[in-house]
Amino acid sequence: MRKLCVSCVVAFGVMSGAASAASKAESCGYQAQVAGAIQQARLDRVRERKVEAHVKAAATWPENYNTAIPLMVPWVYQMKMRDVRKQDLAAAWKELCLQQ
């Protein structure tokens, strides 16, 4: 899980508009919110193909962070449900993002 998560964080480091416009902490915070929303969608048993629309409907982050949703969904949906229930994916994402 950590290996896949790190590769996703590296991919988001390339987000041109978001990374340059916002501070690193703010950007990582928004990315963590997206990860948390996807985790909650999984816990709410939203089907994987409907997650993007479901998460966008309740988005509280800037619109440009919606591009992260299709990249994060497989990361969350490939995890075992017990791991999704027990772990705080938003906090894990933010921690790894800030380390980059």
Residue ranges and their predicted role:
Residues 42, 46-100:
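Compact alpha-helical subdomains of small soluble proteins
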Residues 12-14, 37-41:
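General structural signal for alpha-helix termini and helix-helix connectors
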Residues 1-22:
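Classic N-terminal secretory signal peptides
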Residues 22-38:
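Short N-terminal segments immediately surrounding and downstream of signal-peptide cleavage
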Residues 6-9, 29, 98:
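Secreted/luminal cysteine- and crosslink-motif detector
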Residues 17, 24-27, 93:
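Generic hydrophobic secondary-structure packing signal
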